Amino acid sequence: GASGIGLLRTESVVIKELTEAQQVEAYKTCIKNSGGKPITVRTYDWAADDCGQWMDGVQTRMEEETTALTQLSALMQAAVEAPEGALQVLFPMIPDVDAWRTRMDQMKRCNESLKEKGLPFCGNLPVGCLIEIPAAALMAGEIIDAGADFLAVDLDDLVQYTCGVSRREKPTPADNPAVLRLVQDVMHAAQTRGVPLYLCGIMQKDLETMPAFMRIGVRNFCVESVHINTLKSILMQTEL
């Protein structure tokens, strides 16, 4: 019953050290298996849980840059197999507008490189920002103004960084008033600029809190496939 893939994690393609050509084929397979439905690909997240703590401090800035350019180039090439606009790129770890502009510069460089090589590619992929920390939430409008086509709010991370809690501590409810206010601010920034927004990073324990987000205007949710029917049932019973 899902309308698309809201967040495709790609840490495995980097950890496995796939070449650019291998990444292109991997993304093409995902596009083919999606049956024409939209796919939002989150670029490699150096802070992702499945990267392991051993990654901390090991990767240099140059390695990060090389990894990013290789992945973006592969995505732009694979996108020629998707319906127009069906493959979207979501950038994590964006704390401010400067970080966003760095990603846009990388997209531009990949575009120019692929043109020089004469390879088929899609040069106008929709690009979005993953809102994970309060700083990004407060600057959402400026990030959109700098070129973001859509926003995704990582609820799990936003709760952690807003409330100053560790995942090892007693879980903080996702509908914490401070979190709701931040999400509402992000919603306002997106709505006034005509940009789509959705929630992701929704843990099983937080499903029952989703009506609170629906009441402040959120209409799109990204959850693990096993939770889709449960979330639908909860939302259908919500009184606005």
Question: What residues fall within each predicted segment?
Answer:
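Conserved alpha/beta-domain cores
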Residues: 1-240
